[in-house]
Amino acid sequence: MAIPRNVLGEMELLVFDLDGTLIDSEQDLANSVNATLEKIGRKPLSVELIASYVGQGVAVLVSRAMGAEATPENVEQATEIFLKYYSEHMLDNTGTYPGVREALAELDGRKMAILTNKPVHFSRDLLEGLGLAELFLQIYGGNSFETKKPDPLGLNRLMEENEVPADRTLMIGDSISDVMAGRNAGVWTCGVNYGFGAPTLDEAPPDIRIDDLRELPKLLNGKS
């Protein structure tokens, strides 16, 4: 364990990624991408392949799904189609991963925030629809700032707003962009092994890794 136990117990601010960390949105994202591809006359992609494209924002997701031959204009038009479809179907199949609700309930005494590369209005709508929004002091998305993760701007803002130093802040996510955002901001990092971005964690190992979010309150409370 890279984080000393005494430091784990003193964490004051917990910053969570959303897709692949708290919520399993894989099917709805895949359906939205494939509906977009169908609309523009392209063949559908597998759920697994689309999931591997998630994590750096909608424009990157759509661009990757369309392939290298797509022009910026093509991507922009397809992104508009995707956003419309997803806005109407984002909660068709999406729910929390096993143990997420229990873990968040145990962590409720600490300051918690969301920092995702997903557009902020979708993030808020999802969290409200799942009954989780009230647990978080701030919900920031990929269009909340001038830059997205792995840039540290969002984390720096959250630490400033919550008046918590970097050595008492933990970034929790499923992908390399979460870990690199944490490193760039000088905070501790926790990777979750169940998210669809988890294979990228080997490229930038987080300070700690967990298989289930219910492990986190145990670690922070010194029970594991």
Language-model segments: what does each one mean?
Residues 1-13, 48, 73, 124-224:
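Asp-based, Mg2+/Mn2+-dependent phosphohydrolase catalytic module
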Residues 63-102:
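Metal-dependent phosphoesterase signature
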Residues 2-52:
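Active-site neighborhood of HAD-like aspartate-dependent phosphohydrolases
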Residues 4-5, 10, 88-114, 120-124, ...:
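Short, acidic loop-to-helix structural element flanking the phosphoryl-transfer center
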Residues 15, 22, 96, 112, ...:
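Conserved SAM-binding loop
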Residues 31, 39-69, 75, 98:
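Alpha-helical substrate-recognition element adjacent to the catalytic core
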Residues 28, 57-60, 102, 121-122, ...:
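Short alpha-helical
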